[in-house]
Amino acid sequence: MAAALRVAAVGARLSVLASGLRAAVRSLCSQATSVNERIENKRRTALLGGGQRRIDAQHKRGKLTARERISLLLDPGSFVESDMFVEHRCADFGMAADKNKFPGDSVVTGRGRINGRLVYVFSQDFTVFGGSLSGAHAQKICKIMDQAITVGAPVIGLNDSGGARIQEGVESLAGYADIFLRNVTASGVIPQISLIMGPCAGGAVYSPALTDFTFMVKDTSYLFITGPDVVKSVTNEDVTQEELGGAKTHTTMSGVAHRAFENDVDALCNLRDFFNYLPLSSQDPAPVRECHDPSDRLVPELDTIVPLESTKAYNMVDIIHSVVDEREFFEIMPNYAKNIIVGFARMNGRTVGIVGNQPKVASGCLDINSSVKGARFVRFCDAFNIPLITFVDVPGFLPGTAQEYGGIIRHGAKLLYAFAEATVPKVTVITRKAYGGAYDVMSSKHLCGDTNYAWPTAEIAVMGAKGAVEIIFKGHENVEAAQAEYIEKFANPFPAAVRGFVDDIIQPSSTRARICCDLDVLASKKVQRPWRKHANIPL
């Protein structure tokens, strides 16, 4: 009897315990369902950014949203977002209210792929607080930049921001500095690209300025330190946003931006094409594309492209298109310092950097702006192991007080320094004039050019015949005869060739074949330089 009672008591306790367990399980399941619902709600909220009304306003401005831009830039389905649930930490000025909390804050960050190649990206969301930068916003950007440096992958920033978030005060300024530091740390390690797709003002402008390439969208993007209202109050100048910091200003006058595109879609599609020229990092080679353009292809039209009259202009871009693969050339800064041409192309499938003087503009003279433009490009190519092809037709440095007062000596030295410092394969082709110090600067043999060619039309000399005759034959009765004598002796490729300053005098039609062959040989080039902390380029 007693045993039966004990069994009954144990059974009762077990029944109570089981009931409690069932209740606990139901509670846990309910909690899990609640958490999952919250997660999904947060995701839906994050995907909407600042809400449908603000998305509609963004579209009315002719602009895509932050997420639409990422979707168009990256391969379909490749985007892996990070920090979607991050929110700002500001509690002042009513910012702690739920209505002022947006999952992801005002920037979308993550990684994805462009034509199968890894890239990290951040896209500022103008629909959330005007894309303004908070401490959390900066933290998200810094996190993906750190990851990109660690794994060796490029960073692309899609900028559309009203500036620092005033409510956060100095924390926003600290956030900018954190980003700037990473821009500098990543420089020369991974490619960094900025695409300005809206406003970018105040301290925000320095991050794009520190990146390797800055592109803009016409009519909707602006870059300036201080806006029109501040300019008016300080200098009494009346200027519009477009005039002060629009795409035209920065691609034609300041040189801050490298190219401008018609709209968001055009910009993002071109950015995908541009990305294909670049290596993932300084430790990786540039991608090699299958080439259907024969490497030994002759270009007969080049034999007559240089005019017989040395003062007559021609278009160096035509020469570049003729020798590169499939005539494809992605020019950088095409509307700034037009007397020098820089850009990317492929030779037998390999990415190469092209530098060339433009006889159509200022006779191809080097000046302050062209020297800085060329130097910056050469240094990028050298940092990322991209071979350099240089086409030379340069009568010298542009004379005048404006150039001298502006510091042409220092700025011209930048281009010289960049070519001398570069250890990548360097092939130089002198098509016509190579006069004076400008001859030395343009990737000459004396600056460790690997292969230096001259066309039969090349004139390699201290200066042009007219100027030389006025000095050498001053007071000579027959000036024309003296000039002819000088041309015969010096204004041709032979004086340089007999001294080994050019490796060969080639027929222009064979230029592509010779360059492709040289690049094959130079692919294994290695150069050891003395150790130093860093160089001191004449800034």
UniProtKB/Swiss-Prot annotation:
Superkingdom of origin organism: Eukaryota
Effect listed in the UniProt record for changing residue 519 to P: In PA-2; affects heteromeric and homomeric assembly
Assigned EC number: 6.4.1.3
Region entry Acyl-CoA binding, spans: 325-358
A biological process from GO: short-chain fatty acid catabolic process
Pfam families, per database record: Carboxyl_trans (PF01039)
Keyword Phosphoprotein: yes
pH curve summary: Optimum pH is 7.2-8.8 for the propionyl-CoA carboxylase activity as measured for the holoenzyme.
Residues modified to N6-acetyllysine: 99, 474, 489
Variant or mutagenesis effect after changing residue 168 to K: In PA-2; no effect on affinity for propionyl-CoA; decreased reaction kinetics for the propionyl-CoA carboxylase activity; decreased thermostability affecting holoenzyme oligomerization
Record: transit peptide: 1-28
Matches recorded under InterPro entries: AccD/PCCB (IPR051047), AcCoA_carboxyl_beta (IPR034733), ClpP/crotonase-like_dom_sf (IPR029045), COA_CT_C (IPR011763), COA_CT_N (IPR011762)
GO cellular component, one term: mitochondrial matrix
Region annotated Carboxyltransferase, chain positions: 32-533
Modified residues (Phosphoserine): 71
Linked pathology: Propionic acidemia type II: Life-threatening disease characterized by episodic vomiting, lethargy and ketosis, neutropenia, periodic thrombocytopenia, hypogammaglobulinemia, developmental retardation, and intolerance to protein.
Function: This is one of the 2 subunits of the biotin-dependent propionyl-CoA carboxylase (PCC), a mitochondrial enzyme involved in the catabolism of odd chain fatty acids, branched-chain amino acids isoleucine, threonine, methionine, and valine and other metabolites. Propionyl-CoA carboxylase catalyzes the carboxylation of propionyl-CoA/propanoyl-CoA to D-methylmalonyl-CoA/(S)-methylmalonyl-CoA.
Assembly and binders: The holoenzyme is a dodecamer composed of 6 PCCA/alpha subunits and 6 PCCB/beta subunits.
Similarity section: Belongs to the AccD/PCCB family.
Protein name according to UniProt: Propionyl-CoA carboxylase beta chain, mitochondrial
Source organism per UniProt: Homo sapiens (Human)
Gene of this entry: PCCB
